[in-house]
Amino acid sequence: QLDSFFGAPGAAQALDTVFNEFSAALSSLAAEPAGAAARAEVIATAQGLAGGLNRMAGKVQDARNDADAAIRASVEEVNAALATIEDAERQLAALPGGHGRADVLDARDRAIDALARLADIRVSERGAGRIAIHTTGGAVLFAGKASRLTFEPVHPLVAGAEGGGIGMTDGEGHAQPLHSGLLRSGEIAGLLALRDETLPALQQGLDAVAAGLARAASE
């Protein structure tokens, strides 16, 4: 998706094309400072480049908002998986012997697999077939009772605005932020990095190009 922001190299609306056209116009103007046609070409190509930068900036913000929405959906998936695991543990404790346990264990395993896709987790045995689930950073997701994640998206997420963080309330009611030290990898961590690091860095690069364009146009 990030590559699509710039356009296919050499395409008419691609950033490299409009930038090269602007650079060529500046060179022509430098060779013929009094030429009206050269000045007009600089203005036209500068406008084209500015328009391209604005379009890209809009795509960056759209992508940040998309990432924010995806974080919310992923948090809801985590909560659903943890609720399934808690329910499975309750059923397992009530089932006599091996009767009906296989289906419940299968459901629990599927929920664990879903969690492993969304977050970096470590599953440990607690005895009597019970399990505990932590993130590799140490956050307790399940230990007899399911933790619950919370997330409030910021919409619209405009340039320069910070996105919301993820909170966690464990099974005993203790709340804490689920920061990057506790959530190191997985789909949610990747979305947070995209929203808070990768895309803002791209926006800063666009801002730097726009500032350089303004300086060049004023010289």
Predicted segments with their positions:
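Structural signature of extracellular appendage/secretion-system components
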Residues: Q1-E219
